[in-house]
Amino acid sequence: MVFFMSRGLPSNKTYDPVFANNDWAAIIDACHANEVPDTWVSDGSCYKDMDIGGKAYRIDIIGKNHDDLADGTGKAPLTCQMHDCYDTTYQMNSSNTNAGGWRDCQMRTQTMPALKALLPAEVQSRIREVNKLTSAGNQSSIIVTTSDEL
């Protein structure tokens, strides 16, 4: 699972150099202010737990200024993924194929929005769409761009 946060105006706050020592409000503020410390991605501690439904899930930073924002305004300050996602296994499609590719699959159109709704409200409201390149599916070599939040 990947999520992205917006960028915006500078802040006058300081952030703990260890990613996990910051609360989600501070992480969101750093992203919004485009002031994500380099140490968050370089010191080996680029993960933090997030409480979802009473269970802690590990969230890892997998990119800084890597993904293009779908609205064309620049790069997403952070790209994160969830570790050990959920205890439930989900299919890409009910047919057990990748027909239709990522853009049209059940995982993207139904499952991901349902999973987003389980995230803490303060995080949900700061997730922004980015462009991701994916296969058109069904053994196609065509690459398509999708705008994704998760």
Task: Name what the model sees in each region.
Residues 3-150:
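Collagenous Gly-X-Y triple-helix signature in extracellular proteins
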